Amino acid sequence: MQTVIFGRSGCPYCVRAKDLAEKLSNERDDFQYQYVDIRAEGITKEDLQQKAGKPVETVPQIFVDQQHIGGYTDFAAWVKENLDA
């Protein structure tokens, strides 16, 4: 599964999401992730809203296999429910 984390520097929840994704990628052969710094890439809130298909107010915004999961708390819950990590 391919996970994309849209975040920014200085965001503690972005760091947590990246750390969890790194842990999963080290433990599982079927998990890969990409971290995208929205400031460095010039991605706007409107761009994220369009990709998510709904309003977004915070980062990180996380997608698994192109499905919008939400922020860090949503991602951690998704991992617990789907991957037992």
Curated annotation (Swiss-Prot):
Q: Which domain of life is it from?
A: Bacteria
Q: Which residues form the Glutaredoxin domain?
A: 1-85
What assembly does the database describe for this protein? Monomer.
Instruction: From the Swiss-Prot or TrEMBL record, give the protein name.
Output: Glutaredoxin 1
The record's PROSITE patterns line, in alphabetical order, gives:
GLUTAREDOXIN_1, GLUTAREDOXIN_2
Instruction: Name the Gene Ontology biological process terms.
Output: cell redox homeostasis; cellular response to oxidative stress; cysteine biosynthetic process via S-sulfo-L-cysteine; deoxyribonucleotide biosynthetic process; sulfate assimilation via adenylyl sulfate reduction
Any idea which UniProt keywords this protein has? Answer: Deoxyribonucleotide synthesis, Disulfide bond, Electron transport, Nucleotide-binding, Phosphoprotein, Redox-active center, Transport
GO molecular function: any one? Answer: nucleotide binding
Role, per record: The disulfide bond functions as an electron carrier in the glutathione-dependent synthesis of deoxyribonucleotides by the enzyme ribonucleotide reductase. In addition, it is also involved in reducing some disulfide bonds in a coupled system with glutathione reductase.
Record SUPFAM superfamilies: Thioredoxin-like
Recorded consequence of changing residue 11 to A: Abolishes AMPylation by YdiU
Residues where O-AMP-tyrosine occurs? 13
Phenotypic consequence of residue 13 to F/S/T: Abolishes AMPylation by YdiU
Instruction: Please give the GO cellular component terms listed in this UniProt entry.
Output: cytoplasm
Disulphide bond pairs: 11-14
